[in-house]
Amino acid sequence: MPSDASEVYRRYLSAVMLHGHASAKACELGATDLYALNILQLTGPMTPGELGTRTGLTTGPTTRLIDRLEQAGYVRRAPDPGDRRKVIVEPIGKPADLDRVMAPARQRIGELLRGYSPEQFEVLFDYFARATDAYQEAAEQLRSHNAG
């Protein structure tokens, strides 16, 4: 990849991360809190242990994260239907504050996407799907390497 393309890509990733941090702050959340909430909204309820693994947090920080999200009204703890001895964390609806805060960026990105042909759109979202898998695999490798 030419260096200018690499720089454009790095700027894009930085802009996405900075927007995530700004969005979290606007909703009075930490960046990790917003990330955890996004995980729950995308994958559904999970145990605190699973959430800790996905966020890279240990038990204590995961408990405090869940406490903050629960206190803010974004999640609730509920008995695990498969094992009543366990607790799961589940998102509660769609957070209105988050939707309000993210609406301008979503609208702008939607406008940009409407400028692409169906073929370009397909390539773009194929890339997003493949890059998601690549980043998740790379993150897992880093976690495994650091744990060992």
Predicted regions, residues:
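N-terminal leader segment of winged-helix/HTH proteins
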Residues: 1-27
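Residues at secondary-structure transition points
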Residues: 3, 27, 31, 35, ...
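Short amphipathic alpha-helical/adjacent loop interface patches that line ligand
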Residues: 9, 16, 33, 106, ...
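N-terminal helix-turn-helix DNA-binding core of bacterial DNA-binding proteins
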Residues: 19-58
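Canonical helix-turn-helix DNA-binding module
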Residues: 45-89
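Charged, amphipathic alpha-helical coiled-coil/dimerization segments
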Residues: 70-122
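Terminal interaction helix/tail motif
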Residues: 103-148
